Amino acid sequence: MKSTLRISLKAGERIFINGAVLRVDRKVALEFLNDVTFLLENHVLQPEGATTPLRQLYFIAQMILINPEGKDHSTAMFRKSITMLLTCFKNEEILAELKRIDALVSTGRAFDALKAIRGLYAIEDNILNNQELPPTMVEQIRREIAPWR
């Protein structure tokens, strides 16, 4: 880390840091002085929120960050999922981003991958609403890559 990183949290807010969950009881500012893997509570997707293929991929990528003990399993699930999604989606923008997201995770940049996946939600919603991806395929993807349900 080239410089320090300062994050402000509100009372009751949680942050996931290197696999640990911290909750603050008052407004605080945290200053990270070295490299750290963290995820703010408002970016954490709960299992029940993983209702679309890309949200499922996000959930798996987030598990790489917040569950270090299960990182190998989560990474294997991510690989399986990304391969499946690359064969299912036809949208060129999504396909290009999925390849970039795969490279990010492969180089240990799961946090950046989460941001990129969130950026695809609107396109995915449009595809699903217009049924450009058949509902049967969406259901198959859900079954294949939803092991935490």
Swiss-Prot record:
GO biological process: bacterial-type flagellum organization; mRNA catabolic process; negative regulation of bacterial-type flagellum assembly
Disulfide bridges in this chain: none
Keyword S-adenosyl-L-methionine in annotation: no
One Pfam assignment: FlbT
GO terms of molecular function: mRNA 5'-UTR binding
UniProt keyword list: Bacterial flagellum biogenesis, Repressor, RNA-binding
Keyword Phosphoprotein included in the entry's annotation: no
Homology family: Belongs to the FlbT family.
Function comment: Has a post-transcriptional repressor function in flagellum biogenesis. Associates with the 5'-UTR of fljK mRNA and promotes its degradation.
Protein name per the record: Probable flagellum biosynthesis repressor protein FlbT
Species assigned in the record: Rhizobium etli (strain ATCC 51251 / DSM 11541 / JCM 21823 / NBRC 15573 / CFN 42)
